[in-house]
């Protein structure tokens, strides 16, 4: 009876671990190959612009404030599933500093960086 219980627990733990790993890595290849387009800020009107990106656990929505054809603020409306404030802050700071979404990804958070950039790209499309 004890061996059976141990076997059931081992199988349950193995199944749970496999499902968790699948959930965390599903869509990773597609996200790594995601293209970030160009944004022409001269074509963007002043004001707050909302944009979203929807894919697996990286879905998010941001609001981008533009003043005099410059990005002045970026706010998260709906964050990615496993959000890290230091990642979003670093991405948004780079975008504001460079006035471009063509930035280097945050080390260890390449896919999350791309997800935020796609939302910003969506917000700034004319």
Model-assigned labels for residue ranges:
Residues 1-61, 65-126:
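Intrinsically disordered terminal and processing segments
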């Amino acid at each position: 009876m004890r061996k059976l219980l141990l076997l059931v627990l081992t199988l349950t733990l193995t199944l749970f671990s496999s499902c968790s790993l699948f959930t965390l890595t599903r869509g990773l290849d597609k996200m790594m190959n995601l293209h970030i387009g160009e944004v022409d800020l001269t074509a963007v009107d002043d004001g707050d612009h909302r944009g979203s990106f929807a894919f697996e656990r990286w879905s998010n929505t941001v609001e981008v404030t533009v003043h005099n054809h410059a990005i002045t603020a970026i706010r998260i409306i709906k964050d990615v599933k496993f959000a890290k404030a230091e990642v979003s802050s670093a991405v948004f700071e780079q975008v504001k500093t460079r006035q471009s979404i063509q930035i280097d990804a945050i080390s260890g958070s390449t896919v999350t960086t791309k997800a935020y950039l796609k939302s910003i790209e969506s917000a700034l499309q004319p």
